Amino acid sequence: MAIEYTTNNSSRFQSVVADQLIGFGLSVEPRQVITSSVVAARMVARAVPHGAKVLVVGAEHLREEIAWQGLEIVERAEDDPAAVVQGWYPDMTWNQLAQAAFAVERGAAYYVTNRDLTIPRELGIAPGCGSMVQAVVNATGVQPAACAGKPESAMYDEARLLAAADGAEPVRRELCLAIGDRLDTDIEAGNRGGYDSLAVLTGVTNPHELMLAPRHLRPTFIARDLRALNKPMPAPRREPDGRWVCGRCEAAIDAAGRLTVNDVTAMDALRAACCAAWEASDDGRALDADSLPDFDVIGAGE
């Protein structure tokens, strides 16, 4: 099974990300890491002629990826670039944003690595790439032609290409599984691209958020962590009386909109509960949010 690690981070080199993952006990090679800079550079290279000028606003990693694609990096709008590609890095200046805006106003195609509005730093939450992108959009009135990062599906599309052998067809979409802990990036990107997805509970998403997720943020599968990849996962099914059953667990919503389950410690119960809650939402039935079970699935490993 081929494994690719995708990240919206556009400033960290693949080797740096790989070293961090290795520190978690994983066996990872840098080529398995797909950053938003890798994806953005490949997008730009397909859109402009080989050797075309590209104005780059971003970290050294983004610049190296653009150069590796055979494109000429320029710094000023006066150099008449065919495209502008914008990422995030902490030393970005007003003049760099202005040059990007001037080039876009002159007709350069506009690409961005991601549109994350914020980025966590040691001292708190700081403006992310998306906030800087919005400055250029505000100045020009032009939206990016494409975004490399999630929740767009481009990163998963590129992963299919990069996982294939040289000259081979991309890995088929139906053979791919997008895995992540964020519904509004990892899972939404999978849904936008038509990929099956697995939401894990080892990060920011909790059971309540899963049960209340709107359609575009719902995963195909739910698990406590990645150990579930090596275990069978029963499919939830709807019974004629309206109950949802998954394995030995079940969930139901009564006439008052209260959701009940028979086991708050089992992942199968959470899977059934999500199906019951999602069905009620899609049918326009009221769901008593205060009645949502407080699942305790830490360590369930299912």
What do the predicted segments below correspond to?
Residues 18-31, 41, 45-302:
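Asp-based, Mg2+/Mn2+-dependent phosphohydrolase catalytic module
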Residues 1-39:
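Alpha-helical substrate-recognition element adjacent to the catalytic core
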